[in-house]
């Protein structure tokens, strides 16, 4: 791929230009094979591992945001050797919540801050697009991450989530999961295309057949595995207040497994203190989130939440999710102030989505999709 190598050559040249005090030029040596001996192999692949590792380390550390982070992806495209080393450095920084490869969309977000995203809605096609925000502006698209399209089938509605904004087939390589609602649109089930743990069984039905999705985890055939539920509470008395919701998510088992998209034991998305978890027989755990209770503003005569400027339009769809705290913990109340996911309206068809650990971009997007649509029994 001459284009990638050309771009990378300029990037490496600039990197060493600004680090001349740390690098030296090696003298010519007879141990270096002549060009004729390298005709059958790439000079990029023949680079010394120490030098190659230093180059990729610098690129990975300095290019921590998109669009500059595409240089890290370029490194992984040079050769197999470059790809292995790049993946090693990318895996070592998983706790940072950086999004580099498609597999990062199913890994937990940052621990100490939120990944800020935008959701764009196309009402005509019932399609929703998730972008990673690159600037504070709500009008900039940012970097495309995922897309979802709503399909109505019989008594339920499905949202097919894909890496490709033009391909929503469950048999596609771009298929990453789906969201299914009941008839009333108050109960939702989240399905992942990859098993959440070893021994997980796909859901029953023809939609659970195994697919050839390879962009998230090439070694694991895709299917439909239940990984979470979102429920909206009924409001039959029509009392004042926003929607009330509870989200129950399945977290990977503590032991590392290949089915967790490269997730290691010290990077599991349940690594948040005092979050209530219910252990399962399969070794995984359920993380329970609930919407943060708003306060009534007497002057404005409306329910209010502090979105810190990330939501500008009042809407029943707006919400913030916090951890359900174990009441046996004496200091547990403090965790209810940490917003793990917030979603809100900033335009007619534009919404913000900010998430952090233990949620992944895929899980956060699925939860936000449940807010679209009318829920007469809950409002």
From Swiss-Prot:
One of its GO terms (biological process) is pollen development. GO terms for molecular function: DNA-binding transcription factor activity; transcription cis-regulatory region binding. InterPro entries: Tubby-like_C, Tubby_C, Tubby_C_CS. Residues 18-28 have a biased composition (Polar residues). Ubiquitous. Residues 18-41, 193-212, 248-278 are annotated as: Disordered. Residues 42-97 form the F-box domain. One of its GO terms (cellular component) is cytosol. Coiled coil: none annotated. PROSITE patterns: TUB_1, TUB_2. Transmembrane segments: none annotated. Belongs to the TUB family. This is Tubby-like F-box protein 7. It comes from Arabidopsis thaliana (Mouse-ear cress). The gene is TULP7.
């Amino acid at each position: 791929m001459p284009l990638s190598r050309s771009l990378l050559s300029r990037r490496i040249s600039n990197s060493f230009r600004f680090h001349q005090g740390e690098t030296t030029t090696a003298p010519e040596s007879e141990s270096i094979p002549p060009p004729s001996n390298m005709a059958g192999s790439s000079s990029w692949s023949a680079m010394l591992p120490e030098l190659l590792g230093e180059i990729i380390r610098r690129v990975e550390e300095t290019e921590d945001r998109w669009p500059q982070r595409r240089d890290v992806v370029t490194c992984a495209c040079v050769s197999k050797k470059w790809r292995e080393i790049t993946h090693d450095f990318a895996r070592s920084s998983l706790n940072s919540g950086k999004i580099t490869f498609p597999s990062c969309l199913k890994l937990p977000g940052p621990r100490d801050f939120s990944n800020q995203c935008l959701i764009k809605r196309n009402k005509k096609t019932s399609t929703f697009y998730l972008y990673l925000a690159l600037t504070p502006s709500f009008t900039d698209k940012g970097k495309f991450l995922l897309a979802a399209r709503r399909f109505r089938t019989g008594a339920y509605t499905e949202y097919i989530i894909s890496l490709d904004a033009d391909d929503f087939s469950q048999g596609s390589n771009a298929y990453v999961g789906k969201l299914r609602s009941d008839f009333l649109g108050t109960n939702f089930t989240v399905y992942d295309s990859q098993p959440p743990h070893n021994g997980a069984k796909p859901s029953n039905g023809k939609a659970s057949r195994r697919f050839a999705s390879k962009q998230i985890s090439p070694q694991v055939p895709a299917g439909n595995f239940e990984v979470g539920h979102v429920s909206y509470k009924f409001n039959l008395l029509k009392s004042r207040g926003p929607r009330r919701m509870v989200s129950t998510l399945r977290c990977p088992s503590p032991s590392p497994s290949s089915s967790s998209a490269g997730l290691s034991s010290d990077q599991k998305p349940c690594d948040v203190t005092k979050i209530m978890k219910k252990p399962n027989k399969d070794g995984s755990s359920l993380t329970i989130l609930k919407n943060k209770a708003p306060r009534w503003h007497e002057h404005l005569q409306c329910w209010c939440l502090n979105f810190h400027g990330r939501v500008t339009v009042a809407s029943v769809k707006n919400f913030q999710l916090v951890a359900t705290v174990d009441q046996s913990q004496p200091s547990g109340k403090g965790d209810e102030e940490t917003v793990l996911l917030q979603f809100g309206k900033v335009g007619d068809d534009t919404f913000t989505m900010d998430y952090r650990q233990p949620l992944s971009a895929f899980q956060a997007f699925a939860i936000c999709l449940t807010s679209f649509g009318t829920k007469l029994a809950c409002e």
